[in-house]
């Protein structure tokens, strides 16, 4: 009898399925952007913006997409994961977006010269929310010479469809808004 029960349990567990993991990357909102190649001799003549690594709050430093389930509860998805670390995706989108906005400057993740502008971005919230909203918030600091610009940012967008793919697309749109606002503020000051 124990043998039959064991086989039945084994058969039932073999038939159950574990949901597949889905991997996501922020959309390439800058497709077709002018991604010029700058040689070393040309870059020495242009001002540089050094985009430092994005700093994420602790809840965002994981592979799962963060979702706020109530006014005080958060969950990190186990089946819906970032294909590449979120900080790297955000930094790459920021570099490409700023390069588009500043075509006469070198925008890079590495310092190329001693005289450069430095951009540091902290992301505290980058998630979907129970009411269909997408929240992106944090702050950034831009230093160039003796001048320092420090600004918070907060973007709240409505997710137009259900599901993680729509959430990731809306997060990408929100990040594009943050990049545009950073570029606009820098341009207005210099």
Model regions and ranges:
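C-terminal/domain-edge helix-coil "capping" segments
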Residues: 20-23, 27, 31-38, 161-190
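N-terminal secretory signal peptides
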Residues: 32-52
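Surface-exposed short loop/turn segments
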Residues: 17-34, 100-146
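Short secondary-structure boundary motifs at beta->alpha junctions and helix caps
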Residues: 73-81, 147-177
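N-terminal segment of the mature soluble domain
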Residues: 46-115
